[in-house]
From Swiss-Prot:
Keywords: Cytoplasm, GTP-binding, Hydrolase, Magnesium, Metal-binding, Nucleotide-binding. Monomer. Its cofactor is Mg(2+). Residues 128-148 are annotated as: Disordered. It comes from Methylococcus capsulatus (strain ATCC 33009 / NCIMB 11132 / Bath). This is GTPase Obg. The keyword Transmembrane helix does not apply. It is found in: Cytoplasm. Mg(2+) binds at S173, T193. GO terms for biological process: ribosome biogenesis. One of its GO terms (cellular component) is cytoplasm. Belongs to the TRAFAC class OBG-HflX-like GTPase superfamily. OBG GTPase family.
Length: 345
């Protein structure tokens, strides 16, 4: 399925049913009085977050949603049936904005979250409700009010704990394939990854975290070059970034330090708080270098970047160093959760 992270939809809530003008007519009761019932309320439209969806692509083919209209009231004080609500399922992580006014309506960050986006119309009142001591036979009823109608802009920001950054062909897709059940395309050319991928990384029997892989960044990405910048927003919800660097980039011939600096520069230019997130350096493809060259190459990259945060040496293809990396990531995330819980208390 094609990955789509923005869509526009139209939602129409149901109108309220009209109140009824009716009078009781029975044998031997010539003046039965008013018995017109109220109408039913119109159905409302809700968005519901679901972990079973990961794209907004379906809304390209079905973009207009309507809730049911309330039924009109009838005689014998019968109230009209309320219209059924309309529930629209969207991926968890969807941000909802009124396309006409720009109003931020909500952010569906947890599976099962429900957001009211169009309220159904209020029911009309039947003439039985207007009877009084001075008006025994009212010939008055009110119509139902119209339901709300909106055009909504939906934007999906994937929810992941850890995000992967790096130049094209740095091995990000190989890494997420190696540590999770995600199966992004892997090939020996740039921009193999064309859209974000999510994978659940399991550490032990009971613990896990979600990892996101986005297309590689190139110089000028913040101004629109390449593919990665349009997907950087999917990393804004992450708690940790792993900067993957190819330590033996024989295909591109780009010095690893230069490549890493370009990614960092694009991250800072794009902004939105990504440059402030915790970031670990992951030196990939260590299986390609002889042991005596590996140490000097790693030291050259670390010194060239003036890197003081954690550094990991891995081979995503061979599986080297992955166990330590995933366990340390899990430990870091758990420490963050405990710190967050303590601050809330």
């Amino acid at each position: 399925m094609k990955f789509v992270d923005e869509a526009e939809i139209r939602v129409d809530a149901g109108d309220g049913g009209n109140g009824c003008i009716s009078f009781r007519r029975e044998k031997y009761i010539p003046f039965g009085g008013p018995d017109g019932g109220d109408g039913g309320d119109g159905g409302s439209v809700y968005l519901v977050a679901s972990d079973n969806l990961n794209t907004l692509a379906d809304f390209r083919f079905h973009s207009h949603f309507r809730a049911q209209r309330g039924e009109n009231g009838s005689g014998n004080n019968c109230t009209g049936k309320s219209g059924e609500d309309c529930f629209i399922h969207v991926p968890t992580g969807t941000i909802v904005t009124d396309a006409d006014t720009g109003e931020h309506m909500g952010d569906l960050t947890r599976s099962g979250d429900r957001l009211l986006v169009a309220r159904g119309g209020f029911h009309g009142i039947g003439n039985a409700r207007f009877k009084s001591s001075t008006n025994r036979a009212p010939r008055r009823a009110t119509p139902g009010t119209p339901g709300e109608r909106r055009t909504l802009h939906l934007e999906l920001k994937l929810i992941a704990d850890v995000g992967l950054l790096g130049m094209p062909n740095a091995g990000k897709s190989s890494l997420i394939r190696a540590v999770s059940a995600a199966r992004p395309k892997v090939a020996d050319y740039p921009f193999t990854t064309l859209h974000p991928n999510l994978g659940v990384v399991r550490v032990g029997d009971q613990r896990s975290f979600v990892m996101a892989d986005i297309p590689g960044l190139i110089e000028g990405a913040a101004e629109g070059a390449g593919l990665g910048v349009q997907f950087l927003k999917h990393l804004t919800r992450t708690r940790l970034l792993l900067h993957v660097v190819d330590i033996d980039p024989y295909e591109t011939g780009i010095n690893p330090v230069t490549a890493a600096r370009k990614v960092i520069a694009e991250l800072c230019k794009w902004g939105h708080g990504l440059e402030e997130k915790p970031r670990w350096l992951v030196l990939n493809k260590i299986d390609r270098l002889a042991p005596e060259l590996l140490e000097s190459r790693c030291r050259e990259i670390i010194d060239g970047l003036h890197w003081t945060d954690p550094v990991y040496r891995i081979s995503a293809i061979q599986g080297e160093g992955l166990d330590r990396l995933t366990r340390d990531v899990m430990r870091f995330l758990e420490q963050q959760e405990r710190r967050s819980d303590a601050e809330q208390e």
